Amino acid sequence: MEITFLGTSSGVPTRSRNVSSVALRLPQRAEVWLFDCGEGTQHQLLRSDVKISQITRIFVTHMHGDHIYGLTGLLASCGLAGSGQPIEIYGPPELKDYLKACAKYSHFKLPHHIRFHPIHPGILYEDAEFSVSCNLLKHRIPAYGYRIAESDRPGRFNVEKAKSLGIPPGPVYGELKQGKTVTLPDGRNIRGQDLCGERETGRKVIYCTDTVFCEGAIALSEDADVLIHEATFAHQDAQLAFDRLHSTSTMAAQVALAAQVKQLIMTHFSPRYAPGNALQLDDLLQEARAIFPNTILARDFMTYEVPRRSSD
């Protein structure tokens, strides 16, 4: 699992930061899942090493323009490319009407292989490898955070031990690797878990924006490997955060601490903290680290590989 930040600015782009979009790359299945698609995201994708052709799912948090204005252009390009690969889109119910209106008035057809899924709190998608769920956050309009959870994996299969027990290679190895108990032709029952190393706990990535500090974000983020959380304002601008229902750096850190996450990555920064101003992003970083030391700042085109972990 690799996270690539395509846009890390709040509201409007700056010279060094585009508006919101994050790509989650899943190399083992050659897929990219996109979270939000602000204006200019297509250009950011072209400047990155993320392949547009691998995008299979797009998750939208809410209907503010800095999170959706790039979606129509991206989908139009996907349609022109003619790959025919299904793209599943998850977002608020209004998103479907928005896309249809854009298509109608700009005279293009939405690609036929796009499927829309209105979101609701709970599990939105699940297969053998991953599940995606969402929870309501606290913003001026309905906004949802997403939790991507990887399934636990069996530990490494000990082939030599299996051979020493007289188990010949074959389909039975596949069952044992999954931790199943199998009965051999001689009547012996062999437990797969006895031939596998420590079970590998699945990784969890959380994407929380836009929101002020809320219990919903904490519940969604519990025991995550990575929490991507908005930090629009510095602590001294907390009143602005409460007025506009955005988070400060310290609010993001408090969510990370309460949820006991392993790594906090802050994003969605107000342009007011640009270099040369009285307060800068390094100040927000220090504020957050005073509460939650494992904090870093996202920047456009930064890639973070989510490390695997063993069972706790």
Swiss-Prot record:
Its cofactor is Zn(2+). The keyword Metal-binding applies. Binds 2 Zn(2+) ions. Zn(2+) 2 binds at residues 66-67, 210, 268. Keywords: Endonuclease, Hydrolase, Metal-binding, Nuclease, tRNA processing, Zinc. The active site is at 66 (proton acceptor). It is an enzyme of class 3 (hydrolase). Belongs to the RNase Z family. Homodimer. Zinc phosphodiesterase, which displays some tRNA 3'-processing endonuclease activity. Probably involved in tRNA maturation, by removing a 3'-trailer from precursor tRNA. This is Ribonuclease Z. It comes from Crocosphaera subtropica (strain ATCC 51142 / BH68).
